[in-house]
Curated annotation (Swiss-Prot):
Keywords: ATP synthesis, ATP-binding, CF(1), Chloroplast, Hydrogen ion transport, Ion transport, Membrane, Nucleotide-binding, Plastid, Thylakoid, Translocase, Transport. F-type ATPases have 2 components, CF(1) - the catalytic core - and CF(0) - the membrane proton channel. CF(1) has five subunits: alpha(3), beta(3), gamma(1), delta(1), epsilon(1). CF(0) has four main subunits: a(1), b(1), b'(1) and c(9-12). ATP binds at residues 170-177. This is ATP synthase subunit beta, chloroplastic. The gene is atpB. The lineage of its organism: Eukaryota, Viridiplantae, Streptophyta, Embryophyta, Tracheophyta. The keyword ATP-binding applies. InterPro entries: AAA+_ATPase, ATP-synt_VA_C, ATP_synth_F1_bsu, ATPase_a/bsu_AS, ATPase_alpha/beta_chains, ATPase_F1/V1/A1_a/bsu_N, ATPase_F1/V1/A1_a/bsu_N_sf, ATPase_F1/V1/A1_a/bsu_nucl-bd. It holds the Pfam family ATP-synt_ab. It is a peripheral membrane protein. One of its GO terms (biological process) is proton motive force-driven mitochondrial ATP synthesis. It catalyses: ATP + H2O + 4 H(+)(in) = ADP + phosphate + 5 H(+)(out).
């Protein structure tokens, strides 16, 4: 018997393959199929029926293991409440597929690609499987190039690689969300690109806050959704481990379409990459695998690699990924963050001390790193300027204890000059954001890399020693700082 499984997320005419549930253990279920009709690994299975209370059940599962005796073990993507042994299981004959393309912008999806924002169905022309191989070597773009963000502190001291992976470290309330939204805004304006945000295993409240803030800052255009700059995919803390393990792949699949078909530069945000590993660990235990170091899954490196290797630049476009990294108990040697670090090209560390001083973005200029900051990649001028800025800030950090105990007057003339320049640099690293205009009232600034380098060179050379340090706070390029100083002198 043939049946059109369009309603089950598969758009081909396939022979109906029906099994039944033999065992349910939490989010894991075993199903038996007729001899010779075994589903493939990663095939999507659908359980439909009624629970004892008469309510409709529709649970999607993914095949993880072939057990023998015509049985498979699958992991559920939603709650298994109400499922009973003997219920029918339909093999869709293909992996889970999700809607892709322009119709996804401005919308929120779950792991199955179903909209969860109450704005009606998605009118997508195409669906793509979430399990795709990484691009072949011949498709990759191996040229090292910087991905300009328009944010001074990032572009100068820890530049992002086009098609690279960046780790974003920072506690609560130091400005992660605002930095993410500014990057989404800037890639749309400067690169004509789009962004995909994957909320993996984080708080539902945070996901809702981010959505609300994106609407307020016009990153999501409520009046005309197609003009939005981002698609959101959420699999939050309350979801079963199967959903949290696969939601990163759903977000990545949407991003790959923009890169490969629309030939765009895409920003992919994953918040939080640790929760992806954590979900994989839960699934691994449920499937009966022997745990590895610190209780993690034995397949940790393979799972991380299969996700990270798909995030890359091709000759058509690029996916640059920014991943929030939670470090359990601040232990950097924990297998989850340690495996993540192997894939990162740059780290952006947000500092609570800078946020307390009111310096935003609160990116720590000494702790943030990038493999791109090499003279043969960024050029001698950029490299020398960045090193000069770091040395000045490092010296200021060393002198802070002396200043706190004895005061500025006890320093040598040279050290006092270093401190004055370091304070100007610290303030010049701050910048007004476009997405914060609604809250601050000051217009946002996009600063090109050339302007950034020029500004810091002028501070380091001593050309601007006569200007007050307040003139450098929350401005764009150096011309704005000199103009601000001129206005304040006229007022005095």
């Amino acid at each position: 018997m043939k049946i059109n499984l369009l309603t089950f997320g598969v758009s081909t005419l396939v022979e109906r393959n029906i099994g039944y549930i033999t065992q349910i253990i939490g989010p894991v279920l075993d199903a038996a199929f007729p001899p010779g009709k075994m589903p493939n690994i990663y095939n999507s299975l659908i359980v439909k029926g009624q629970n004892p209370a008469g309510q409709q059940i529709n649970v999607t599962c993914e095949v993880q293991q072939l057990l023998g005796n015509n049985k498979v073990r699958a992991i559920a993507m939603s709650a298994t409440d109400g499922l009973t042994r003997g219920m029918e299981v339909i093999d869709t004959g293909a992996p889970l597929s999700v809607p892709v393309g322009q119709a996804t912008l401005g919308r929120i999806f779950n792991v199955l690609g179903e909209p969860v924002d109450n704005l009606g169905p998605i009118n997508a022309d195409k669906k793509s499987s979430i399990h795709e191989p990484a691009p072949a070597f011949t498709q990759l773009d191996t040229k090292l190039s910087i991905f300009e963000t328009g944010i001074k502190v990032v572009d100068l001291l820890a530049p992002y690689r086009r098609g690279g992976k960046i780790g974003l470290f920072g506690g609560a309330g130091v400005g992660k969300t605002v930095l993410i939204m500014e990057l989404i805004n800037n890639i749309a304006k400067a690169h004509g690109g789009v962004s995909v945000f994957g909320g993996v295993g984080e708080r539902t409240r945070e996901g809702n806050d981010l959505y609300t803030e994106m609407k307020e800052s016009k990153v999501i255009n409520e009046q005309n959704l197609s003009e939005s700059k981002v698609a959101l995919v959420y699999g939050q803390m309350n979801e079963p481990p199967g959903a949290r393990m696969r939601v990163g792949l759903t977000a990545l699949t949407i991003a790959e379409y923009f890169r490969d078909v629309n030939k765009q530069d895409v920003l992919l945000f994953i918040d939080n990459i640790f929760r992806f590993v954590q979900a994989g660990s839960e699934v691994s235990a449920l499937l009966g695998r022997m745990p590895s170091a610190v209780g993690y899954q034995p397949t940790l490196s393979t799972e991380m690699g299969s996700l990270q290797e798909r995030i890359t630049s091709t000759k058509e476009g690029s996916i640059t990924s920014i991943q929030a990294v939670y470090v359990p108990a601040d232990d950097l040697t924990d297998p989850a963050p340690a495996t993540t670090f192997a894939h990162l090209d740059a780290t952006t560390v947000l500092s609570r001390g800078l946020a307390a001083k009111g310096i935003y973005p609160a990116v720590d200029p000494l702790d943030s790193t990038s493999t791109m900051l090499q003279p043969w990649i960024v050029g001698e001028e950029h490299y020398e300027t960045a090193q000069g800025v770091k040395q000045t800030l490092q010296r200021y950090k060393e002198l802070q204890d002396i200043i706190a105990i004895l005061g500025l007057d006890e320093l040598s003339e040279e050290d006092r000059l270093t401190v004055a320049r370091a304070r100007k640099i610290e303030r010049f690293l701050s910048q007004p954001f476009f997405v914060a205009e609604v809250f601050t009232g000051s217009p946002g600034k996009y600063v090109s890399l050339a302007e950034t380098i020029k500004g810091f060179q002028m501070i380091l050379s001593g050309e601007l020693d006569s200007l007050p340090e307040q003139a450098f706070y929350l401005v764009g390029n150096i011309e704005e700082a000199t103009a601000k100083a001129g206005i304040s002198q006229m007022e005095d």
